[in-house]
């Protein structure tokens, strides 16, 4: 039986992290030794911005109707539209709750042998809810740029992971 590798992602839109995730998934799929799954919380676009090998399974945890509403929330705040601000705040809380809940459910119930996490909050969830039988890898793409709080958050988030990979030099 082939081993399964899952890569956790916030979304598959534009960005260096997203490009790296897809590049890794495609490279692993081409080896033909593993079943590869990208698990994306948000589906921001109908089709991924980057080409994904047909052997890579992509799973979206939230419907495309539930996507970040930061822009709408900021506009309501900036324009002092209090009713809109209240609605957008509630929507934001709902999205964040579902984002967390859906990823926890995936991590708890997956049959993946290896899970690669790509963000601090995903490291935290993988650390807390990942099975002891699963190889857990954190993969950090951001440089801390002398932001010690961020560096501390990263360090704290990986304490229960098996491995940690830094993309940029610290």
Placement of each model-derived feature along the sequence:
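N-terminal strand-loop element at the rim of the active site
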Residues: 7-14, 27, 31-90
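Membrane-proximal helix-turn-helix segments that form the acceptor-binding/catalytic region
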Residues: 101-109, 143-166
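An amphipathic, basic-hydrophobic alpha-helix
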Residues: 74-114, 152
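A short, active-site helix/loop in glycosyltransferases that binds the activated sugar's phosphate group
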Residues: 125-126, 162-170
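Extreme N-terminal starter segment of soluble prokaryotic enzymes
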Residues: 2-6
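Short His-centered aromatic/hydrophobic patch
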Residues: 96, 117-122
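Histidine-centered beta-alpha loop that forms part of the nucleotide-sugar donor binding/catalytic region
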Residues: 10, 63, 119-120, 140-143
